[in-house]
């Protein structure tokens, strides 16, 4: 039992290790080549697919691909229209990009756990994680980009003086004694937005990836009749969790998109 436990522990640790340059040990400032590579490839494929569908779009009866794209566009535009009351020409495409990009990165969790590591090992790459959104560095990078957009829209809608006035006078009032409490509360609110975005997405996807690895450990646990029983339980568990996980990856992509729209809308509107 101890050896089996150690084997499973080593298996999980191996699959949870990122590909970094120069054998870096990681940390917040580490460059995770696997997360960057997978996210960029998925982003390029998503943009290329939409570009091809846009080129082939017709005014007549749409094909299945065009109809699917139009459904997604209408769905995302409806979400933006319900929340944001300004010019949607920039925020609409941004929301679409966020939703589909995060969804595709989440969907990498549905690949067999050992598939990409097995492929990369053929090229001499020891570690390779397939799910960028299970990397806290990646989710924080995306949430900090949203944070920059929040600040940008705040200055754009209210001006520098108007935004600074809001930081010191909302929500308690304009009295000088309330300036510092107002400012501190607004700082906490601002900081909580990127943190909540990053941690929510990371936590759900990291947990989902870990569950897949624990289930995969059943495939090699035990021998004889017990081993085959665990193997069958692993297949059933993998299938059931995979079906349930489709809902999770869709909801998390939707939540990230909606919160991005809400936060930017709050920055755009005057208090």
Feature-to-residue mapping (PLM):
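Selective transmembrane helix interface/packing segments
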Residues: 1-271
